[in-house]
C-alpha cells in the first residue's frame, strides 16, 4: 500500500506565528512529533483534530493582536468535536459540559446569555489564543498523544509569549494548567487561576469572574477588551 505523505510541514500556519516559532520547529522534540504523526497517519489511525485544523489556534488568533491565552489540556477525542481551539466545538455540535460551565460563568460574570453554539472562533479572532497543551489525539483515546512532545512545544509558546510580549492575560483552569504558571512572568502579565470548568472538578469554577477581570486588566494596559458574546 502506498504511504500517505501528510506531514506537519505541509499543514498551514500563519506566517507571523511560523516565524515566531521557527526555532521550535527545528528542535529534536518537534522532529519527533512529526515522525510520530506521520507514523500514525500511515497506520490509518484517526487523529483529531483534522490535519488542517491542528494549528487553528494560531491561524485564527493574530500574533500581533494577542491579548489572552486560555490553556486547555488536549483535544476532544470524539468525532466532529475537536477544531484546534481549546474548549471549542464546531457549530451544530452538542456543547460539552466544561464549555457549558464556561458559558454559565459568562452569564454570572457579565450577564451574557449562554450561547447555542460552542464555536469560540470569534474569541480567537479578537486575540484570544485558545491553546491546548497537547495538539492532537487518537480517536476515542483521551491523552493518547501525551508522550509525543507536544507539551514541550506549548510550554515554549507560553514562555516565549511571556518573554516577548507584555500585558497579556493567562487563564489557567485546573491543576494541569496551573502548573504552567512557572513559565509566566507575573510582573508583566495577569495570571488568573481557577478550578477546571469540568463538572467533575471538586471546587467550583463558577464565580471566578475571569472574563470581567481580564477585560478590566486589558483596559488598564490600554488594550481593547474582548467581546465575549459568541457570534
Swiss-Prot record:
Main location: cytoplasm
Keyword DNA damage: yes
GO biological process, one term: base-excision repair, AP site formation via deaminated base removal
Top-level taxonomic group: Bacteria
Keywords linked to the UniProt accession: Cytoplasm, DNA damage, DNA repair, Hydrolase
Subcellular location: Cytoplasm
EC number: 3.2.2.27
Alphabetized InterPro entries for the sequence: UDG_fam1 (IPR002043), Ura-DNA_Glyclase_AS (IPR018085), Uracil-DNA_glycosylase-like (IPR005122), Uracil-DNA_glycosylase-like_sf (IPR036895)
Protein encoded by which gene: ung
UniProt xrefs under CDD domains: UDG-F1-like
UniProt similarity note: Belongs to the uracil-DNA glycosylase (UDG) superfamily. UNG family.
One annotated GO molecular function: uracil DNA N-glycosylase activity
Active site residues of this protein: 74 (proton acceptor)
One Pfam family cited in the UniProt record for this chain: UDG
GO cellular component, one term: cytoplasm
Disulfide bonds: none
Gene3D superfamilies listed in its UniProt record: Uracil-DNA glycosylase-like domain
Protein name: Uracil-DNA glycosylase
Amino acid at each position: 500500500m502506498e504511504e500517505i505523505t501528510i506531514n506537519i510541514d505541509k499543514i498551514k500556519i500563519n506566517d507571523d506565528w511560523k516565524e515566531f516559532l521557527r526555532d521550535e520547529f527545528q528542535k529534536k522534540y518537534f522532529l519527533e512529533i512529526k515522525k510520530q504523526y506521520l507514523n500514525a497517519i500511515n497506520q490509518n489511525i484517526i487523529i483529531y483534530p483534522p490535519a488542517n485544523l491542528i494549528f487553528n489556534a494560531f491561524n485564527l488568533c493574530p500574533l500581533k493582536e494577542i491579548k489572552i491565552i486560555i490553556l486547555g489540556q488536549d483535544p476532544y477525542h470524539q468525532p466532529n468535536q475537536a477544531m484546534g481551539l481549546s474548549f471549542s466545538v464546531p457549530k451544530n455540535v452538542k456543547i460539552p459540559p466544561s464549555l457549558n460551565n464556561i458559558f454559565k460563568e459568562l452569564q454570572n460574570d457579565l450577564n451574557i446569555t449562554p450561547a447555542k453554539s460552542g464555536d469560540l472562533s470569534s474569541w480567537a479572532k479578537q486575540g484570544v489564543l485558545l491553546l491546548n497543551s497537547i495538539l492532537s489525539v487518537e480517536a476515542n483515546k483521551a491523552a493518547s498523544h501525551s508522550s509525543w512532545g507536544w507539551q514541550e512545544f506549548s510550554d515554549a509558546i507560553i514562555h516565549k509569549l511571556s518573554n516577548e510580549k507584555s500585558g497579556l492575560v493567562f487563564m489557567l483552569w485546573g491543576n494541569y494548567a496551573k502548573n504552567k504558571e512557572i513559565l509566566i512572568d507575573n510582573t508583566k502579565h495577569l495570571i488568573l487561576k481557577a478550578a477546571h470548568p469540568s463538572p467533575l472538578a471538586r471546587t467550583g469554577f463558577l464565580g471566578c469572574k475571569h472574563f470581567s477581570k481580564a477585560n478590566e486588566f486589558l483596559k488598564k494596559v490600554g488594550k481593547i477588551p474582548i467581546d465575549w458574546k459568541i457570534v
